[in-house]
Amino acid sequence: MKDILVVGKIKEGQFPKFMGFMKSDEGIAERRKIADLSKTIGTVTPDQRKVMFKIAVHNMDALHAFLNGSNPVSKPVFDAVMESYEIHELNQL
């Protein structure tokens, strides 16, 4: 497993829709294909325009598909809510 930091920029007013999907049964099922959900840590900026998640990823290809629109489950939601995202690999010093 790799520790990954994902930073996403959310379109204005779309945070509730984003979180609704992430907490839905459908969203959770897709996220389980990517990472160990028990190790996920998330936060959001006060204006709800940026989110940050530290995740323990076991399938990097699935992570990229989830974020870039090639996953058919996440694509409709992410097309509507995401402006951009960054993926960073974390290394322990």
Locations of regions flagged by a protein language model:
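Short, exposed beta-strand-loop hairpins at the edges of beta-sheets
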Residues: 77-79
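Short S/T/G/P-rich N-terminal loop/turn motif that feeds into the first structured element of a domain
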Residues: 1-73, 83-93
